[in-house]
Amino acid sequence: MGKRRIALYHAFHTSLPIMAGYGFLGLTYGIYMHELGFNFLYPMLLAITVYAGSAEFLLGNMLLGSFHPLQAFLMVLMVNARHLFYGLSMLEKYKGLGWKKFFLIFGMSDETFALTSASKIPEGTDKGWYLLWITWLDETYWVIGATLGDLIGPFLTFDLKGLDFVLTAMFTAIFADNWLREKDHTSSISGLIISGLCLTIFSADHFIIQSMVIILIFLTLKKRKV
């Protein structure tokens, strides 16, 4: 097997939790877009070009009204501001990857960040191709789920309420897997404590960015001490 196929093999197994989560959540998004009156091309193209779940749900409503570019820009920036901190924390891991880093930056979703930041590169696997395949597979799962959701939407008659819980379950599984593999739980415990405190102080709608800033500072200081 060539290095690309080896990397794809390992990346596929690593990304299986994302396939399950994005499959169901993508279906939900596609069904939502169908209910708004859009055909499958809209969720498919938005999934390919925007690839930011929360922003895509918002854009569905925006496309129905008068388009305000500045409002759309500020809304998407506010919803996805946490990605700034994802990028900062991945600078070292993406160093020296050449052209691959451009797609890695574009495809940095919450779930992909959770995988690539915690995942150890399998022995004998090319780092660049491994990270690239994970990122590509994750986006592919989302695009397929969103497209299928719109296509099968007219044929679904059962209640889909609560389907978005799969995202919470997926993050829990990723956290548990990382916990079992790591020798030092300081980073995981600090993340839980800091997020919990920020949730209490800033409320559920405003705690994510504050949590990311504090966690980034804490981990940077911890790394310098080491």
Predicted regions and their residues:
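Alpha-helical transmembrane segments and their membrane-interface exit regions
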Residues: 51-55, 78-85, 170-176, 195-196, ...
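Short, Lys/Arg-rich, polar N-terminal cytosolic tail immediately upstream
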Residues: 1-10
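Helix-loop interface residues and adjacent transmembrane-helix termini in multi-pass membrane transporters
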Residues: 37, 66, 96, 124, ...
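Membrane-embedded alpha-helical modules
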Residues: 128-210, 217
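Juxtamembrane membrane-interface segments at transmembrane alpha-helix termini
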Residues: 55-61, 85-90, 176-181, 199-208, ...
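Helix-loop-helix junctions within the multi-pass membrane cores of secondary transporters/permeases
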Residues: 3-4, 73-164
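Pore-lining transmembrane helices
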Residues: 13-105
